[in-house]
Regions:
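Flexible glycan-contacting loops in extracellular carbohydrate-active proteins
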Residues: 180-192, 196-199, 388-411, 532-559
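Short carbohydrate-recognition loop motifs
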Residues: 83-103, 244, 275-297
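Extended recognition patches within non-cytosolic domains
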Residues: 2-3, 207-238, 403, 418-449, ...
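Carbohydrate-binding surfaces in secreted/extracellular proteins
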Residues: 170-174, 374-378, 387-389, 512-533
Length: 617
């Protein structure tokens, strides 16, 4: 790699088999080849990201086996005929026909928590359908396949829906919070299944976590996942630009992050589930109301904590379309030692928060803009040696903006999250009724094909680096540190193995370039030379790159792009990199300066990048 650069990110974020894909911009043979960075996180679907469309993307899983092979289901007084015309223009639908009263088809499984059972159905001899899950109170819902409305429901269902998908087909959904052992589909009559004959068409059944039916996932003998998968790198588009998001392990302590009614309700607030479109694009935001005032109406989560602990609460609140003068809010109540109660109100029109009582140490983080929603986050640190925390989300916390007063108020919310730590991390969905943990994001070390000795240029563009130790490291062959990049005391810094070499006035975010040329080293940050006086070169060479964090570190890394050149770019190019990012003319001039590349190498880069299109995250 003596005459090549290595790039990770930029406009070419890609993944292959769960690993990040960087690419070498011309090796000594003139070829452009992928370089894989091994990525790990964990074995569940607790992580999320903001996708390129601006919506929160989750991991999804169809828990029903043989989701459209109904001959592999068990029938009770029914027959199933394949090869029928489907809702999607295929011949993948089935005719489900009953031969006795209450005939049905079912699939055995083991499921718990908030789940949505859905299927595509169409009337035939029967003009109604029935979905039922067996467990608890046996939740069920009837659906009128002629008029497209939900009929009778029962058994503790949370919500139900029927969606017209055209051609007489509907997608029907049953939403519940029950431990179940099977899922059933019935041909039915008007709010009954007692008819001794009848038939409907069925296709593409799905059982998944959450309050909405998402895009169908085909399964066979095993469950299948989609969306943001286990151990998949998270390319996060918060702010519109793709960044590699690396976060520490965090646990969401809220029992239900979207099913607000599943949490403890104090004072009887009115909760309406599936009320509005949420930041993930589904109809799974809730509405909370106080229609009477007089007493506080709130959602509560209470649990034991360590003395003098720090917790961060975050919630998405739909933006108001006009100014507000009555406020919802959040309350932290630490008890068991010297009790400390803090109240924070939020303004969903302006995207601001105000502490109207602060007995614990509070940090009100800047509201994050999620299109139609604000994400409000508050950190509270106990200083009274308390061992119990009660966290409250209020329908109305203040009618005057200065003191806690109950009143009439409603607002729309989504994504309740309470995590131990001093800052909010990305949303962790929880439908379990307990806590759920997102595991640590880690990229293992990447070894270059050959080490870089002598002159080099390192370009890094990050949205954020929060670290107590180096978050991006460049090491020699023997593993000793050559250069480590991180943020320290609100400014960028680089450690050369023996000293810090960046001036303390350097910004903590943005673009940074390290240029090593002979015995000289320079640091450019956001267009300005920020080299500390007396900075020295580390001549160990670069053989490995590590973009990682340990479970002991409270790091967030949001890496937009990283480029490694095995030559020293000019000062003007370095300055331009930290203002404009990697531009084609810089890459072109670099390639032109490398006289060992074969003719046509630049064209091969274009071809290689085109071939990456199917891998782009």
């Amino acid at each position: 790699m003596s005459n090549a650069s290595l790039e990770l990110g930029g406009d070419n974020w890609a993944a292959k088999d769960g690993n990040l894909l960087g690419y070498a911009v011309g090796d000594s043979s003139g070829k452009y080849v992928p370089r894989e960075f091994t990525f790990t996180r964990g074995s569940n679907l607790a992580a999320t990201r903001v996708a390129a469309n601006g919506l929160i993307e989750k991991g999804r899983e169809n828990l029903l086996l043989h989701s459209n092979s109904f001959n592999n289901w068990t029938n009770s007084n029914t027959s199933e005929t394949s090869g029928q015309s489907g809702y999607d223009g295929s011949s993948d639908a089935w005719l489900l026909e009953k031969s006795a009263a209450s005939g049905f088809i079912f699939k055995s499984l083991s499921g718990s928590g908030v789940q949505t059972f859905s299927a595509y159905v169409k009337a035939n001899a029967s003009t109604w359908g029935l979905l039922q899950c067996i467990g608890g109170s046996n939740p069920y819902a009837y659906f009128d396949l002629g008029t497209g409305v939900v009929g009778s429901i029962g058994g503790g269902t949370i919500s139900n829906s029927i969606e017209d998908v055209g051609g007489g087909w509907y997608r029907i959904s049953l939403i519940h919070n029950t431990t179940i052992s099977s899922a059933r589909i019935y041909p039915a009559e008007a709010n009954t299944a007692s008819g001794t004959s009848g038939s409907i068409y069925i296709q593409d059944a799905q059982l998944e976590q959450g309050l909405v039916a998402t895009d169908y996932i085909e399964t066979g003998a095993t469950t299948v996942q989609a969306g943001l998968l286990e151990d998949e790198p998270r390319i996060d588009y918060t702010g519109g630009t793709g960044s590699l998001l690396l976060e520490p392990s965090r646990t969401n302590e809220f029992s239900f992050s979207e099913y607000a009614s599943g949490n403890t309700l104090t004072g009887s607030p009115i909760i309406t589930e599936n009320y509005a479109i949420s930041p993930d694009g589904g109809n799974n935001a809730f509405r909370i109301q106080d229609t009477t005032g007089g007493t506080f109406k709130r959602i509560t989560e209470s649990f034991s904590v360590s003395a003098n602990s720090t917790y961060t609460q975050s919630i998405f609140v739909k933006k108001a379309t006009s100014a507000v003068s009555i406020y919802g809010g959040v309350g932290f109540d630490y008890s068991g030692g010297t009790r400390q109660i803090s109240y924070i109100i939020f303004d969903e029109y302006n995207g601001t928060m105000t502490a109207i009582q602060s007995q614990s140490t509070l940090t009100l983080h800047d509201a994050e803009d999620y299109g139609d929603y604000w994400r409000f986050s508050i950190t509270a640190t106990d200083t009274g040696s308390n061992n119990y925390l009660s966290l409250n989300i209020y329908a109305c916390l203040s009618t005057n903006g200065t003191s806690p007063t109950a009143g009439v108020k409603d607002w729309i919310g989504y994504g309740l999250q309470l995590e131990e730590g001093s800052y909010p991390t990305s949303y962790i969905p929880n439908h379990s009724g307990g806590s759920v943990t997102r595991e640590l994001d880690t990229i293992n070390e990447f070894t270059l094909p050959s080490s870089i000795e002598g002159d080099c240029t390192i370009f890094i563009d990050t949205r954020e680096l929060l670290a107590s130790n180096k978050s991006i490291q460049f090491e020699a062959t023997d593993g000793t540190l050559t250069y480590g990049f991180y943020s320290y005391s609100n400014h960028y810094d680089v450690y050369n193995g023996s000293a810090f070499i960046v001036d303390s006035s350097a910004d903590a975010n943005g673009k940074i370039v390290l240029k090593q040329s002979g015995s000289s080293v320079k640091i450019f940050v956001n267009g300005v030379d920020k080299t500390k006086a007396g900075a020295t070169v580390n001549s160990n060479g670069i053989a490995k790159i590590i973009v990682s964090q340990s479970s002991a570190q409270s790091n967030i890394v949001a890496l937009k792009q990283m480029q490694l050149f095995p030559t020293a770019l000019s000062d003007a190019q370095c300055s331009a990199l930290t203002v404009e990012g990697l531009k084609e003319e810089i890459l072109t001039s670099y390639i032109a300066a490398v006289d060992t590349l074969e003719d046509g190498a630049e064209a091969r880069l274009d071809t290689y990048l085109q071939n990456l299109e199917d891998l782009i995250v």
